[in-house]
Amino acid sequence: HWMPVDYYNGADHAVAHLLYSRFWMRFFYKLGLVPTPEPFKRMMYNAYIMAPDGQKMSKSKGNVIDPMEIMDSGYGADALRVYEMFIAPYDMDAPWDPRGVPGTYRFLNRAWNLVQEFVDKDPNDSLDANEKTAQELLRLTHSTIKKVTRDIEDEKFNTAVASMMEMVNGLYKIKESHGIDMSDEWRFALESLIQILAPFAPHITEELWREMGHDDTVH
């Protein structure tokens, strides 16, 4: 009664899974047992993260990347998750780059520092951004929300991460030009960044959401 569904799996399973799932669904449909001949609304095949040398990871070859070692080395789970989403399109094989996790770790640190600078401001500081700053913040935030939303819906996770990186860069440029204040526009920009980043980096965003004064979860 819950068919059809979305289907996600590795390309190496495609032939067998499609053969048997579609065969049985069409067989049941002809018997009048199910309402549709197709079991899937949408099919997506995920690619592989290869070893740094471009070969498939294998224990026998000794080229497997251990995620626990990366997390325990000080980078944490979120930097690893973000890099896995950023490394390549969902359906394209890509070699592991040892420089990748340090890069996403720096990105998350920059986002963290922006939020910390905002929450550490004196509450008596200016509550109003000047008109130019307000427009820049709103334009950057809304355009990023639109791009990230579209990319997530299309499973383009790597470009979603790239858009969030561009947003952080843009926020730093605005900060360097006009500073950070306690305005609604800065709050909106930072809270929006936290919310769109949450599916990719759930741990740091939960902490940042609390830092922004929320008692509920960001998820």
Named regions from a protein language model:
Residues 1-92:
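Alpha-helical recognition segments enriched in aromatics with Gly/Pro capping
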Residues 36, 69-219:
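Helix-rich, typically C-terminal accessory recognition domains appended to large enzymatic cores
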